[in-house]
């Protein structure tokens, strides 16, 4: 669906915008090395600061004690042809920010964000010393929506995706399989989904409070 070379004991906000400037993502690393991200659309908050990271087995923590090694910005604008679909040619135009982090145990984590004119995505790329796999116990990635609205989703289920879609206020969704599509009260349509799962568990959305998942 993700150069600053000096870390200090203070918050470190880093920003990335869509090519047309309408969507802005802000990444922040606080004094404890904890990561959050936030998103605004058209200058208005869309996702308020939300947690990132994972907790693994045997004390592995991919959510705190990190320092920024460097941050790299790139832009890509290309057109590719899909074999079938509504449109034959697809424009792939985005700005990318790769935030490279390291903790005291020399665990390295790259957060790769891509912001398009019509959405954004991010992914985790991690390298843990002396292990060939990571047993994930908890995913801390959250989506703290700034506004309520109308949503369309199916209930979270580990057995099937063949369930009836329900229409509910975002704040009334207790859990959901992705994609969860919604329209905020100020008219922004969006959908939360995942992609490129390689040897990794699928995600479900769990309501915590308000419009937070």
Where are these regions (language model features)?
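N-terminal accessory beta-strand-rich subdomains and adjacent acidic, glycine-rich linkers
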Residues: 13-213
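Sec-dependent N-terminal signal peptides
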Residues: 1-7
